[in-house]
Protein backbone atom coordinates (compact mmCIF):
# COMPACT_ATOMS: atom_id res chain seq x y z
CA UNK A 1 0.00 0.00 0.00
CA UNK A 2 1.58 3.26 -1.17
CA UNK A 3 0.88 6.00 1.40
CA UNK A 4 1.99 8.77 -0.97
CA UNK A 5 -0.48 7.64 -3.62
CA UNK A 6 -3.21 7.39 -1.02
CA UNK A 7 -2.50 10.91 0.21
CA UNK A 8 -2.36 12.21 -3.36
CA UNK A 9 -5.71 10.60 -4.15
CA UNK A 10 -7.26 12.12 -1.04
CA UNK A 11 -5.94 15.58 -1.90
CA UNK A 12 -7.07 15.30 -5.52
CA UNK A 13 -10.58 14.37 -4.49
CA UNK A 14 -11.01 16.86 -1.67
CA UNK A 15 -13.34 19.75 -2.39
CA UNK A 16 -14.10 22.79 -0.35
CA UNK A 17 -16.99 22.02 1.99
CA UNK A 18 -18.52 25.21 3.28
CA UNK A 19 -21.28 24.79 5.87
CA UNK A 20 -22.89 26.34 8.94
CA UNK A 21 -24.54 24.64 11.91
CA UNK A 22 -27.52 25.87 13.93
CA UNK A 23 -29.68 24.73 16.82
CA UNK A 24 -33.22 25.56 15.72
CA UNK A 25 -36.37 24.91 17.72
CA UNK A 26 -39.19 22.76 16.40
CA UNK A 27 -41.39 25.87 16.28
CA UNK A 28 -38.84 27.79 14.22
CA UNK A 29 -38.47 24.89 11.77
CA UNK A 30 -42.24 24.68 11.40
CA UNK A 31 -42.53 28.43 10.80
CA UNK A 32 -39.76 28.29 8.16
CA UNK A 33 -41.61 25.51 6.32
CA UNK A 34 -44.87 27.48 6.46
CA UNK A 35 -43.16 30.57 5.06
CA UNK A 36 -41.42 28.65 2.26
CA UNK A 37 -37.95 29.21 3.69
CA UNK A 38 -37.39 25.45 3.87
CA UNK A 39 -38.29 23.46 0.75
CA UNK A 40 -39.19 19.88 1.63
CA UNK A 41 -38.95 19.09 -2.11
CA UNK A 42 -42.52 18.34 -3.25
CA UNK A 43 -41.03 16.17 -6.02
CA UNK A 44 -40.17 13.72 -3.25
CA UNK A 45 -43.70 13.28 -1.90
CA UNK A 46 -43.67 9.62 -2.87
CA UNK A 47 -40.70 9.11 -0.58
CA UNK A 48 -42.47 9.84 2.69
CA UNK A 49 -42.53 6.30 4.05
CA UNK A 50 -42.91 6.58 7.82
CA UNK A 51 -46.08 5.12 9.31
CA UNK A 52 -47.95 6.64 12.26
CA UNK A 53 -46.00 4.66 14.87
CA UNK A 54 -42.63 5.73 13.47
CA UNK A 55 -43.79 9.34 13.32
CA UNK A 56 -45.13 9.13 16.87
CA UNK A 57 -41.78 7.82 18.11
CA UNK A 58 -40.05 10.91 16.74
CA UNK A 59 -42.55 13.18 18.51
CA UNK A 60 -42.02 11.21 21.73
CA UNK A 61 -38.23 11.56 21.44
CA UNK A 62 -38.51 15.32 20.97
CA UNK A 63 -40.86 15.74 23.93
CA UNK A 64 -38.50 13.70 26.14
CA UNK A 65 -35.44 15.59 24.93
CA UNK A 66 -33.85 12.49 23.41
CA UNK A 67 -31.33 13.58 20.73
CA UNK A 68 -32.50 13.04 17.15
CA UNK A 69 -30.23 12.88 14.07
CA UNK A 70 -29.09 16.16 12.54
CA UNK A 71 -31.02 17.66 9.66
CA UNK A 72 -28.92 18.39 6.59
CA UNK A 73 -29.81 21.24 4.21
CA UNK A 74 -28.33 23.06 1.24
CA UNK A 75 -28.64 26.80 0.67
CA UNK A 76 -30.22 27.91 -2.60
CA UNK A 77 -29.34 31.11 -4.41
CA UNK A 78 -32.41 32.83 -2.93
CA UNK A 79 -31.14 31.86 0.56
CA UNK A 80 -33.93 29.33 1.12
CA UNK A 81 -32.96 25.86 2.32
CA UNK A 82 -33.37 22.62 0.38
CA UNK A 83 -33.65 19.40 2.41
CA UNK A 84 -30.87 16.91 1.71
CA UNK A 85 -31.42 14.61 4.67
CA UNK A 86 -34.39 14.96 7.01
CA UNK A 87 -37.50 14.69 4.86
CA UNK A 88 -39.13 12.09 7.11
CA UNK A 89 -38.55 14.11 10.30
CA UNK A 90 -39.67 17.45 8.88
CA UNK A 91 -42.76 15.97 7.25
CA UNK A 92 -43.63 14.33 10.57
CA UNK A 93 -43.41 17.72 12.31
CA UNK A 94 -45.72 19.21 9.67
CA UNK A 95 -48.17 16.31 10.04
CA UNK A 96 -48.26 16.89 13.80
CA UNK A 97 -48.43 20.69 13.90
CA UNK A 98 -49.90 21.72 10.56
CA UNK A 99 -53.43 22.19 9.34
CA UNK A 100 -54.87 20.09 6.52
CA UNK A 101 -53.90 22.61 3.83
CA UNK A 102 -50.22 22.69 4.83
CA UNK A 103 -50.09 18.92 5.29
CA UNK A 104 -51.46 18.33 1.77
CA UNK A 105 -49.10 20.94 0.33
CA UNK A 106 -46.14 19.15 1.89
CA UNK A 107 -47.31 15.62 1.15
CA UNK A 108 -50.32 14.98 -1.09
CA UNK A 109 -51.10 11.75 0.77
CA UNK A 110 -50.47 13.17 4.23
CA UNK A 111 -52.94 13.11 7.10
CA UNK A 112 -53.01 14.82 10.49
CA UNK A 113 -50.88 12.79 12.91
CA UNK A 114 -52.59 11.21 15.91
CA UNK A 115 -50.04 9.71 18.29
CA UNK A 116 -50.09 5.93 18.56
CA UNK A 117 -47.86 3.08 19.65
CA UNK A 118 -46.00 5.13 22.28
CA UNK A 119 -44.48 3.14 25.13
CA UNK A 120 -42.75 5.66 27.39
CA UNK A 121 -45.52 8.26 27.07
CA UNK A 122 -48.45 5.92 26.52
CA UNK A 123 -50.84 8.44 28.11
CA UNK A 124 -50.40 10.54 24.96
CA UNK A 125 -51.62 7.81 22.62
CA UNK A 126 -54.65 8.79 20.49
CA UNK A 127 -53.81 12.49 20.97
CA UNK A 128 -53.45 15.20 18.36
CA UNK A 129 -51.09 18.10 19.10
CA UNK A 130 -54.06 20.27 20.07
CA UNK A 131 -55.09 17.70 22.71
CA UNK A 132 -51.80 17.95 24.62
CA UNK A 133 -51.54 20.03 27.80
CA UNK A 134 -50.18 23.51 27.09
CA UNK A 135 -47.03 22.75 29.06
CA UNK A 136 -46.30 19.70 26.88
CA UNK A 137 -47.04 21.69 23.72
CA UNK A 138 -44.53 24.34 24.81
CA UNK A 139 -41.97 21.69 25.75
CA UNK A 140 -42.28 20.14 22.29
CA UNK A 141 -42.19 23.42 20.37
CA UNK A 142 -39.06 24.67 22.13
CA UNK A 143 -36.96 21.53 21.66
CA UNK A 144 -33.83 22.32 19.62
CA UNK A 145 -32.83 20.32 16.55
CA UNK A 146 -29.32 20.49 15.12
CA UNK A 147 -29.30 21.67 11.49
CA UNK A 148 -26.21 21.58 9.27
CA UNK A 149 -26.51 23.81 6.21
CA UNK A 150 -24.28 23.47 3.17
CA UNK A 151 -23.98 27.02 1.91
CA UNK A 152 -24.14 28.18 -1.69
CA UNK A 153 -20.36 28.42 -1.99
CA UNK A 154 -20.15 24.63 -2.22
CA UNK A 155 -20.08 23.27 -5.77
CA UNK A 156 -22.83 21.28 -7.50
CA UNK A 157 -20.78 18.09 -7.61
CA UNK A 158 -20.39 18.16 -3.85
CA UNK A 159 -24.11 18.78 -3.37
CA UNK A 160 -24.96 15.81 -5.57
CA UNK A 161 -22.50 13.55 -3.75
CA UNK A 162 -23.84 14.57 -0.36
CA UNK A 163 -27.47 14.13 -1.37
CA UNK A 164 -26.68 10.69 -2.77
CA UNK A 165 -24.79 9.67 0.39
CA UNK A 166 -27.03 11.27 3.01
CA UNK A 167 -30.54 10.77 1.71
CA UNK A 168 -31.70 7.86 3.83
CA UNK A 169 -35.45 8.07 3.39
CA UNK A 170 -35.79 4.34 2.80
CA UNK A 171 -36.40 4.51 -0.97
CA UNK A 172 -33.62 4.36 -3.54
CA UNK A 173 -33.62 7.57 -5.53
CA UNK A 174 -33.16 7.70 -9.29
CA UNK A 175 -30.19 9.92 -10.28
CA UNK A 176 -32.51 12.38 -12.05
CA UNK A 177 -34.58 12.78 -8.89
CA UNK A 178 -31.41 13.86 -7.11
CA UNK A 179 -30.52 16.23 -9.96
CA UNK A 180 -33.97 17.80 -9.72
CA UNK A 181 -33.22 18.63 -6.10
CA UNK A 182 -29.60 19.76 -6.60
CA UNK A 183 -29.56 21.68 -9.89
CA UNK A 184 -32.32 24.18 -9.26
CA UNK A 185 -33.11 26.88 -11.77
CA UNK A 186 -34.22 27.69 -15.29
CA UNK A 187 -32.66 24.65 -16.95
CA UNK A 188 -34.27 22.15 -14.56
CA UNK A 189 -37.65 23.80 -15.16
CA UNK A 190 -36.99 23.64 -18.91
CA UNK A 191 -36.30 19.89 -18.76
CA UNK A 192 -39.52 19.30 -16.87
CA UNK A 193 -41.47 21.39 -19.36
CA UNK A 194 -40.03 19.42 -22.30
CA UNK A 195 -40.82 16.14 -20.52
CA UNK A 196 -44.51 17.09 -20.67
CA UNK A 197 -44.46 17.68 -24.44
CA UNK A 198 -47.23 15.54 -25.93
CA UNK A 199 -45.30 14.51 -29.04
CA UNK A 200 -42.42 13.35 -26.82
CA UNK A 201 -44.84 11.40 -24.62
CA UNK A 202 -46.38 9.73 -27.68
CA UNK A 203 -43.04 8.77 -29.20
CA UNK A 204 -41.26 7.55 -26.05
CA UNK A 205 -42.88 4.56 -24.33
CA UNK A 206 -42.03 3.86 -20.69
CA UNK A 207 -43.53 2.31 -17.59
CA UNK A 208 -45.48 4.36 -15.05
CA UNK A 209 -42.80 3.67 -12.45
CA UNK A 210 -40.11 5.00 -14.78
CA UNK A 211 -42.16 8.14 -15.32
CA UNK A 212 -42.56 8.67 -11.57
CA UNK A 213 -38.85 8.38 -10.86
CA UNK A 214 -37.63 11.08 -13.22
CA UNK A 215 -36.75 8.97 -16.26
CA UNK A 216 -38.62 11.27 -18.63
CA UNK A 217 -36.58 14.28 -17.50
CA UNK A 218 -33.39 12.24 -17.76
CA UNK A 219 -34.20 11.30 -21.36
CA UNK A 220 -34.70 14.98 -22.19
CA UNK A 221 -31.39 15.73 -20.46
CA UNK A 222 -29.69 13.00 -22.50
CA UNK A 223 -31.20 14.39 -25.68
CA UNK A 224 -29.68 17.85 -25.16
CA UNK A 225 -26.38 16.73 -23.62
CA UNK A 226 -25.62 14.18 -26.33
CA UNK A 227 -26.77 16.59 -29.02
CA UNK A 228 -24.46 19.36 -27.80
CA UNK A 229 -21.58 17.74 -25.91
CA UNK A 230 -21.30 14.08 -26.90
CA UNK A 231 -17.63 14.54 -27.78
CA UNK A 232 -17.04 15.14 -24.04
CA UNK A 233 -18.69 11.87 -23.02
CA UNK A 234 -16.20 9.23 -21.87
CA UNK A 235 -17.90 6.38 -20.01
CA UNK A 236 -19.81 7.42 -16.87
CA UNK A 237 -23.27 8.53 -17.99
CA UNK A 238 -24.14 9.85 -14.53
CA UNK A 239 -21.08 12.09 -14.29
CA UNK A 240 -21.51 13.31 -17.86
CA UNK A 241 -25.15 14.25 -17.25
CA UNK A 242 -24.30 15.88 -13.92
CA UNK A 243 -21.57 17.99 -15.55
CA UNK A 244 -23.87 19.07 -18.36
CA UNK A 245 -26.71 19.95 -16.01
CA UNK A 246 -24.34 21.94 -13.78
CA UNK A 247 -23.09 23.86 -16.82
CA UNK A 248 -26.60 24.69 -18.01
CA UNK A 249 -27.72 25.62 -14.50
CA UNK A 250 -25.02 28.29 -14.47
CA UNK A 251 -25.87 29.62 -17.95
CA UNK A 252 -28.56 28.65 -20.46
CA UNK A 253 -28.76 31.19 -23.31
CA UNK A 254 -29.96 28.56 -25.82
CA UNK A 255 -33.39 28.03 -24.24
CA UNK A 256 -35.47 29.40 -27.12
CA UNK A 257 -33.47 27.60 -29.82
CA UNK A 258 -33.40 24.33 -27.89
CA UNK A 259 -37.13 24.45 -27.19
CA UNK A 260 -37.77 24.84 -30.92
CA UNK A 261 -35.37 22.00 -31.79
CA UNK A 262 -36.95 19.65 -29.24
CA UNK A 263 -40.48 20.38 -30.41
CA UNK A 264 -39.61 19.96 -34.09
CA UNK A 265 -37.64 16.75 -33.48
CA UNK A 266 -40.45 14.98 -31.67
CA UNK A 267 -43.20 16.37 -33.88
CA UNK A 268 -41.35 14.86 -36.86
CA UNK A 269 -40.76 11.57 -35.06
CA UNK A 270 -44.42 11.31 -34.10
CA UNK A 271 -45.36 11.83 -37.74
CA UNK A 272 -42.78 9.34 -39.02
CA UNK A 273 -43.16 6.72 -36.26
CA UNK A 274 -46.85 6.57 -35.25
CA UNK A 275 -46.13 3.62 -32.93
CA UNK A 276 -43.22 5.43 -31.30
CA UNK A 277 -39.55 4.50 -30.98
CA UNK A 278 -40.12 0.78 -30.51
CA UNK A 279 -38.65 -2.38 -31.94
CA UNK A 280 -40.31 -5.61 -33.06
CA UNK A 281 -43.23 -6.81 -30.98
CA UNK A 282 -42.27 -4.78 -27.90
CA UNK A 283 -44.51 -1.83 -28.65
CA UNK A 284 -44.93 -0.69 -25.03
CA UNK A 285 -41.33 0.19 -24.21
CA UNK A 286 -38.65 2.35 -25.84
CA UNK A 287 -35.10 0.97 -25.44
CA UNK A 288 -33.01 3.81 -24.03
CA UNK A 289 -30.06 3.45 -26.39
CA UNK A 290 -32.43 3.28 -29.34
CA UNK A 291 -34.02 6.51 -28.13
CA UNK A 292 -30.59 8.15 -28.08
CA UNK A 293 -29.67 7.00 -31.58
CA UNK A 294 -32.97 7.92 -33.25
CA UNK A 295 -33.65 11.22 -31.49
CA UNK A 296 -30.11 12.64 -31.73
CA UNK A 297 -29.74 11.57 -35.37
CA UNK A 298 -33.07 13.24 -36.17
CA UNK A 299 -32.03 16.44 -34.38
CA UNK A 300 -28.71 16.46 -36.24
CA UNK A 301 -30.50 16.08 -39.57
CA UNK A 302 -32.96 18.87 -38.72
CA UNK A 303 -30.13 21.29 -37.91
CA UNK A 304 -27.99 20.29 -40.90
CA UNK A 305 -27.80 23.11 -43.45
CA UNK A 306 -28.16 20.54 -46.24
CA UNK A 307 -31.14 18.98 -44.49
CA UNK A 308 -32.30 15.74 -46.08
CA UNK A 309 -35.92 14.68 -46.25
CA UNK A 310 -36.76 12.24 -43.47
CA UNK A 311 -38.48 9.15 -44.83
CA UNK A 312 -40.91 7.15 -42.69
CA UNK A 313 -40.15 3.79 -44.30
CA UNK A 314 -36.40 4.26 -43.98
CA UNK A 315 -36.82 5.13 -40.32
CA UNK A 316 -38.99 2.06 -39.72
CA UNK A 317 -36.41 -0.11 -41.49
CA UNK A 318 -33.51 1.24 -39.47
CA UNK A 319 -35.32 0.58 -36.19
CA UNK A 320 -35.29 -3.14 -36.93
CA UNK A 321 -31.91 -3.25 -38.66
CA UNK A 322 -29.77 -6.10 -37.30
CA UNK A 323 -26.60 -3.99 -37.34
CA UNK A 324 -28.25 -1.28 -35.26
CA UNK A 325 -29.45 -3.96 -32.86
CA UNK A 326 -25.82 -4.99 -32.31
CA UNK A 327 -24.88 -1.36 -31.65
CA UNK A 328 -27.71 -0.93 -29.13
CA UNK A 329 -27.15 -4.08 -27.06
CA UNK A 330 -24.35 -5.24 -24.80
CA UNK A 331 -21.70 -2.77 -23.62
CA UNK A 332 -23.13 0.49 -24.94
CA UNK A 333 -21.82 3.15 -22.54
CA UNK A 334 -18.88 4.52 -24.48
CA UNK A 335 -18.43 7.55 -26.68
CA UNK A 336 -17.40 5.35 -29.59
CA UNK A 337 -20.55 3.21 -29.38
CA UNK A 338 -22.75 6.29 -28.94
CA UNK A 339 -21.22 7.96 -31.99
CA UNK A 340 -21.52 4.77 -34.05
CA UNK A 341 -25.21 4.42 -33.21
CA UNK A 342 -26.05 7.99 -34.13
CA UNK A 343 -23.99 7.95 -37.33
CA UNK A 344 -25.47 4.60 -38.35
CA UNK A 345 -28.98 6.04 -38.18
CA UNK A 346 -28.00 9.21 -40.05
CA UNK A 347 -26.29 7.24 -42.83
CA UNK A 348 -29.26 4.92 -43.31
CA UNK A 349 -31.67 7.82 -43.50
CA UNK A 350 -29.66 9.51 -46.24
Give residue spans per PLM region.
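A generic structural signal for well-ordered alpha-helical surface patches
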Residues: 56, 221, 288, 292-296, ...
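Short amphipathic alpha-helix initiation/capping segments at coil-to-helix junctions
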Residues: 155, 213, 255-262, 283-291, ...
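Eukaryote-biased recognition of C-terminal alpha-helical segments
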Residues: 318-350
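Small-residue-rich helix-loop
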Residues: 235-277, 283, 290
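Glycine-rich phosphate-binding segment of PLP-dependent enzymes
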Residues: 32-39
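Basic- and aromatic-enriched surface patches that contact anionic nucleotides/nucleic acids
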Residues: 2-24, 28, 41-242, 324-332
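Short, mixed-charge aromatic SLiMs
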Residues: 187-189, 243-256, 312-331
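C-terminal hydrophobic structural anchor segments
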Residues: 270-323
Amino acid sequence: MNSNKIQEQIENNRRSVSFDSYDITVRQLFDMIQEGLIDIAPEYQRHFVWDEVRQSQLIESLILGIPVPNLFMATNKDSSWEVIDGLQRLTTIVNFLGDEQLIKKTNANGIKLKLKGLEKLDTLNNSFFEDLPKSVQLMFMTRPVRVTVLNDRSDFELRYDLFERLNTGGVTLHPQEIRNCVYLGKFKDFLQECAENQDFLDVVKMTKNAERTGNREELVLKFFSYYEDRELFVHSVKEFLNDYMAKKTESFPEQTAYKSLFEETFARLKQLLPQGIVRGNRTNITPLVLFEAISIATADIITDENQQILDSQKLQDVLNNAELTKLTTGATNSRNKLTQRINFVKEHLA
